[in-house]
Amino acid sequence: MVLTKLLEYFGFSFFPGEKTFSLPLDICPQKAIIVLVEIYVKEQFTMVYRMNVAGLQRDLPICKVTDSLYIAGFVIFGDQELTVACARELLKVAPEYDYIITAEAKGIPLAHEMARQSGAEKYFLARKGPKLYMTGVFESSVKSITTAKEQKLYLDTADAALMKGKKILIVDDVISTGESLLALEALVNKAGGIIAGRMAVLAEGDAQDRKDLIYLEKLPLFNPDGTVMG
């Protein structure tokens, strides 16, 4: 894998099955070695941020957003133990509500598990695109720290009818810029629902200072070297 990346760095294509290869004479061997070492170190020693959440310890990979900004990737997908634990702890401090709503996609397992543990028969999902089965749609725009361009969220008008006059709890895995929250709030308000509260597993960056957000743990932002931003 490392050798393949080295060849790709110098503009070569690596063909599986080939037993030999050669580098052009104009490529400096010393530079090739340096690049090879850098690739190896990057693959073997990926920066991580170790944290405890809902009584569980997890190592979050630190990922590049811009040249000066890195974030820790919190992925709840596939982690059943973490999903169950986070849902349990959020429900302990949740305000009174009638329904939960979340945005596609990372908030889905959390909302589902919170609904299951609380005995709710239904929760609402704001989709990234309109679906054929929708009777109609409400929409709002969103741009998060991890999305390169503006996205839209869509709510089925059939769900909107059920939300009217009800207390709606907005739930997500991580809140950072708050753009996702604003988009969900717009959908709830448009449907005539009453915002009961806003909850997340983690509050990232400036979101940690929000007084209207209930969360389990703080998630810092990072410098390129993996240190926490001051």
Range-by-range predicted roles:
Residues 44-50, 182-230:
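PRPP-dependent phosphoribosyltransferase catalytic core
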